[in-house]
Amino acid sequence: MRPHPFLYLAVLFGLGLAVYPLCADSRRAGVSTLIWLSLWAAPAGTLAARTGLLGWVVPVAWLLALTPAIGGRLPGLVGVRFEWAYAGLALGGLFGVGWGVGRARLRLSMTLAAALLLLGLLLAALPSLGGLGGPAPWSPALSACFLDISPVSLVLECAGVDWMRHPAVYTPAGADSIDPLLRLPWAGSWAGPCTLLLGCLASWIGIQYGARSSA
Protein backbone atom coordinates (compact mmCIF):
# COMPACT_ATOMS: atom_id res chain seq x y z
CA MET A 1 0.00 0.00 0.00
CA ARG A 2 1.50 3.32 -1.08
CA PRO A 3 1.53 6.15 1.50
CA HIS A 4 -0.73 9.15 0.98
CA PRO A 5 1.29 11.77 -0.95
CA PHE A 6 0.63 14.52 1.59
CA LEU A 7 1.75 12.29 4.45
CA TYR A 8 4.83 11.31 2.46
CA LEU A 9 5.69 14.96 1.76
CA ALA A 10 5.02 15.90 5.38
CA VAL A 11 7.70 13.41 6.41
CA LEU A 12 10.19 14.95 3.96
CA PHE A 13 9.30 18.40 5.27
CA GLY A 14 9.66 17.33 8.90
CA LEU A 15 13.02 15.68 8.33
CA GLY A 16 14.31 18.98 6.99
CA LEU A 17 13.52 20.73 10.28
CA ALA A 18 14.33 17.83 12.60
CA VAL A 19 17.72 19.24 13.62
CA TYR A 20 16.32 22.37 15.29
CA PRO A 21 14.63 20.72 18.30
CA LEU A 22 17.55 18.30 18.68
CA CYS A 23 20.19 21.01 19.20
CA ALA A 24 21.43 21.03 22.78
CA ASP A 25 22.67 24.61 22.39
CA SER A 26 19.84 26.87 21.26
CA ARG A 27 22.35 29.52 20.18
CA ARG A 28 23.55 27.19 17.42
CA ALA A 29 20.15 25.88 16.40
CA GLY A 30 19.61 28.39 13.59
CA VAL A 31 22.88 27.75 11.79
CA SER A 32 22.63 24.00 12.41
CA THR A 33 19.16 23.93 10.85
CA LEU A 34 20.35 25.72 7.72
CA ILE A 35 23.39 23.43 7.48
CA TRP A 36 21.17 20.35 7.57
CA LEU A 37 18.66 21.84 5.12
CA SER A 38 21.48 22.58 2.66
CA LEU A 39 22.42 18.88 2.77
CA TRP A 40 18.87 17.51 2.83
CA ALA A 41 17.31 19.69 0.10
CA ALA A 42 18.61 17.75 -2.92
CA PRO A 43 17.90 14.25 -1.53
CA ALA A 44 14.45 15.43 -0.43
CA GLY A 45 13.84 16.67 -3.96
CA THR A 46 14.78 13.28 -5.38
CA LEU A 47 12.36 11.52 -3.05
CA ALA A 48 9.62 14.12 -3.60
CA ALA A 49 9.84 13.56 -7.36
CA ARG A 50 7.68 10.47 -6.84
CA THR A 51 4.71 12.78 -6.22
CA GLY A 52 5.30 14.89 -9.33
CA LEU A 53 5.00 18.67 -9.20
CA LEU A 54 3.17 18.37 -5.88
CA GLY A 55 6.56 17.67 -4.33
CA TRP A 56 7.50 21.33 -4.67
CA VAL A 57 5.30 22.15 -1.67
CA VAL A 58 8.19 20.91 0.52
CA PRO A 59 10.69 23.77 -0.09
CA VAL A 60 7.83 26.28 -0.09
CA ALA A 61 6.73 24.94 3.29
CA TRP A 62 10.30 25.23 4.62
CA LEU A 63 10.39 28.87 3.56
CA LEU A 64 7.01 29.63 5.12
CA ALA A 65 7.83 27.76 8.33
CA LEU A 66 11.17 29.44 8.91
CA THR A 67 10.45 32.97 7.69
CA PRO A 68 8.79 34.15 10.94
CA ALA A 69 11.54 32.58 13.04
CA ILE A 70 14.37 33.93 10.90
CA GLY A 71 13.02 37.45 11.38
CA GLY A 72 15.14 38.02 14.46
CA ARG A 73 13.85 35.21 16.68
CA LEU A 74 15.83 32.15 15.57
CA PRO A 75 18.88 31.71 17.86
CA GLY A 76 22.14 31.96 15.97
CA LEU A 77 20.61 33.97 13.13
CA VAL A 78 19.67 37.22 14.83
CA GLY A 79 19.37 40.01 12.28
CA VAL A 80 19.18 37.70 9.26
CA ARG A 81 15.89 38.79 7.72
CA PHE A 82 15.62 39.72 4.07
CA GLU A 83 18.64 37.58 3.23
CA TRP A 84 16.68 34.49 4.32
CA ALA A 85 14.61 34.83 1.15
CA TYR A 86 17.80 34.37 -0.89
CA ALA A 87 18.72 31.29 1.16
CA GLY A 88 15.22 29.98 0.49
CA LEU A 89 15.80 30.41 -3.24
CA ALA A 90 19.11 28.54 -2.95
CA LEU A 91 17.40 25.71 -1.07
CA GLY A 92 14.72 25.63 -3.75
CA GLY A 93 17.41 25.34 -6.40
CA LEU A 94 19.12 22.45 -4.61
CA PHE A 95 15.73 20.80 -4.19
CA GLY A 96 15.07 21.30 -7.91
CA VAL A 97 18.33 19.60 -8.86
CA GLY A 98 17.36 16.61 -6.74
CA TRP A 99 13.80 16.65 -8.11
CA GLY A 100 15.14 16.57 -11.67
CA VAL A 101 17.43 13.66 -10.84
CA GLY A 102 14.49 11.83 -9.27
CA ARG A 103 12.18 12.42 -12.24
CA ALA A 104 14.84 11.12 -14.60
CA ARG A 105 15.06 7.80 -12.74
CA LEU A 106 11.96 7.34 -10.58
CA ARG A 107 12.69 3.67 -9.90
CA LEU A 108 16.09 4.55 -8.47
CA SER A 109 14.95 7.52 -6.40
CA MET A 110 15.93 5.99 -3.05
CA THR A 111 19.42 5.08 -4.28
CA LEU A 112 19.90 8.45 -5.96
CA ALA A 113 18.73 10.31 -2.85
CA ALA A 114 21.28 8.43 -0.74
CA ALA A 115 23.99 9.22 -3.29
CA LEU A 116 23.10 12.93 -3.28
CA LEU A 117 23.15 13.01 0.51
CA LEU A 118 26.60 11.40 0.58
CA LEU A 119 27.81 13.81 -2.11
CA GLY A 120 26.54 16.78 -0.12
CA LEU A 121 28.24 15.53 3.03
CA LEU A 122 31.49 15.04 1.10
CA LEU A 123 31.39 18.54 -0.39
CA ALA A 124 30.59 20.03 3.01
CA ALA A 125 33.43 18.14 4.71
CA LEU A 126 36.10 18.75 2.05
CA PRO A 127 37.24 22.23 3.20
CA SER A 128 38.34 20.90 6.60
CA LEU A 129 38.37 17.15 5.86
CA GLY A 130 35.73 16.84 8.54
CA GLY A 131 38.27 17.89 11.15
CA LEU A 132 40.35 14.75 10.57
CA GLY A 133 43.22 16.36 8.69
CA GLY A 134 44.26 18.89 11.29
CA PRO A 135 43.86 22.65 10.86
CA ALA A 136 44.06 23.97 7.30
CA PRO A 137 44.67 20.66 5.47
CA TRP A 138 44.69 22.35 2.03
CA SER A 139 46.40 25.27 0.39
CA PRO A 140 44.41 28.54 0.54
CA ALA A 141 43.52 28.19 -3.15
CA LEU A 142 42.12 24.67 -2.71
CA SER A 143 40.29 25.64 0.46
CA ALA A 144 38.67 28.53 -1.39
CA CYS A 145 37.63 26.20 -4.22
CA PHE A 146 36.16 23.61 -1.83
CA LEU A 147 34.24 26.31 0.06
CA ASP A 148 32.80 27.53 -3.23
CA ILE A 149 31.38 24.11 -4.15
CA SER A 150 30.00 23.35 -0.69
CA PRO A 151 26.19 23.51 -0.51
CA VAL A 152 26.55 24.61 3.12
CA SER A 153 28.59 27.67 2.12
CA LEU A 154 26.08 28.54 -0.58
CA VAL A 155 22.98 28.45 1.63
CA LEU A 156 24.49 30.05 4.73
CA GLU A 157 26.16 32.86 2.81
CA CYS A 158 22.98 33.49 0.85
CA ALA A 159 21.29 33.83 4.26
CA GLY A 160 23.79 36.50 5.25
CA VAL A 161 25.86 34.34 7.61
CA ASP A 162 29.60 35.11 7.65
CA TRP A 163 30.43 31.44 7.14
CA MET A 164 34.15 31.92 6.44
CA ARG A 165 34.58 33.34 9.95
CA HIS A 166 32.44 30.73 11.65
CA PRO A 167 34.41 28.62 14.19
CA ALA A 168 33.63 25.48 12.17
CA VAL A 169 35.47 26.90 9.15
CA TYR A 170 37.76 29.76 10.12
CA THR A 171 40.66 27.73 11.55
CA PRO A 172 39.76 24.11 10.57
CA ALA A 173 39.50 24.97 6.87
CA GLY A 174 42.19 27.64 6.90
CA ALA A 175 39.72 30.38 5.98
CA ASP A 176 41.87 32.81 7.95
CA SER A 177 44.53 32.45 5.22
CA ILE A 178 42.22 32.88 2.23
CA ASP A 179 42.86 36.17 0.49
CA PRO A 180 39.79 38.08 -0.79
CA LEU A 181 41.29 37.75 -4.27
CA LEU A 182 40.89 33.97 -3.94
CA ARG A 183 37.36 33.93 -2.59
CA LEU A 184 34.52 36.20 -1.58
CA PRO A 185 31.30 35.01 0.10
CA TRP A 186 28.38 34.11 -2.14
CA ALA A 187 26.17 37.16 -2.72
CA GLY A 188 22.63 36.01 -2.01
CA SER A 189 21.07 38.63 -4.27
CA TRP A 190 22.34 36.79 -7.35
CA ALA A 191 23.50 33.38 -6.07
CA GLY A 192 20.06 32.51 -4.67
CA PRO A 193 18.09 33.29 -7.87
CA CYS A 194 20.76 31.67 -10.06
CA THR A 195 20.65 28.48 -7.98
CA LEU A 196 16.87 28.40 -8.31
CA LEU A 197 17.14 28.82 -12.09
CA LEU A 198 19.66 25.98 -12.18
CA GLY A 199 17.25 23.82 -10.19
CA CYS A 200 14.38 24.63 -12.55
CA LEU A 201 16.58 23.74 -15.54
CA ALA A 202 17.59 20.46 -13.90
CA SER A 203 13.93 19.70 -13.19
CA TRP A 204 12.97 20.33 -16.82
CA ILE A 205 15.82 18.13 -18.06
CA GLY A 206 14.75 15.41 -15.63
CA ILE A 207 11.17 15.53 -16.92
CA GLN A 208 12.34 15.27 -20.54
CA TYR A 209 14.76 12.44 -19.79
CA GLY A 210 12.19 10.54 -17.77
CA ALA A 211 9.59 10.88 -20.52
CA ARG A 212 12.00 9.55 -23.14
CA SER A 213 13.05 6.64 -20.93
CA SER A 214 9.45 5.56 -20.36
CA ALA A 215 8.45 5.97 -24.01
Language-model region placement:
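Juxtamembrane "helix-exit" motif on the non-cytosolic side of transmembrane helices
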Residues: 18-27, 67-79, 103, 125-136
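Secretory targeting signals
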Residues: 60-106
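Terminal transmembrane helical anchor/hairpin motif
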Residues: 126-193
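Canonical alpha-helical transmembrane segments
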Residues: 37-55, 94-103
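Alpha-helical transmembrane segments
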Residues: 2-19, 56-67, 199
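Alpha-helical transmembrane segments of polytopic membrane proteins
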Residues: 4-7, 26-41, 80-92, 110-120, ...
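Alpha-helical transmembrane segments of multi-pass membrane transporters/translocases
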Residues: 9-17, 169-212
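A structural motif at transmembrane helix-loop-helix junctions in multipass membrane proteins
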Residues: 93-136
